[in-house]
Amino acid sequence: MGMYTDFALKFSVSKGDLEVLEILRYMTDSRVPLKRKTPDHPLFSSSRWDIMARSGRSFIDEVDYLDTVDVMLIGEFKNYGGEIRLFLDWIKPHLAWDLIGYSHYEGDLETVPYFIEGPL
């Protein structure tokens, strides 16, 4: 059956980054269509990129009075293709603030922390 990886990532992106927001909405909600072609990045060639954030409590918080959108991706999936690392590599240039989070493979004793410093 395979082993699962739990993960949680919290970050913000600019409201003006429409392509990234559309992809994130698609990743978190299967009812949202993806109308654009995906970027040329290895993440989008992996087999599970589109479902990695649908198996948990992911959400996108779009508050009207802010210039940024807060995103929380929480999930559990089979990270066989290294999708979490690929996602971090893809999202890094789009961060408005720092990214914090972790992942934990169910067969390991240790949790892997993530911290990517934002542009400020």
Label each PLM-derived region with a short phrase.
Residues 1-33:
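Short, extreme N-terminal segment that most often corresponds to the first beta-strand
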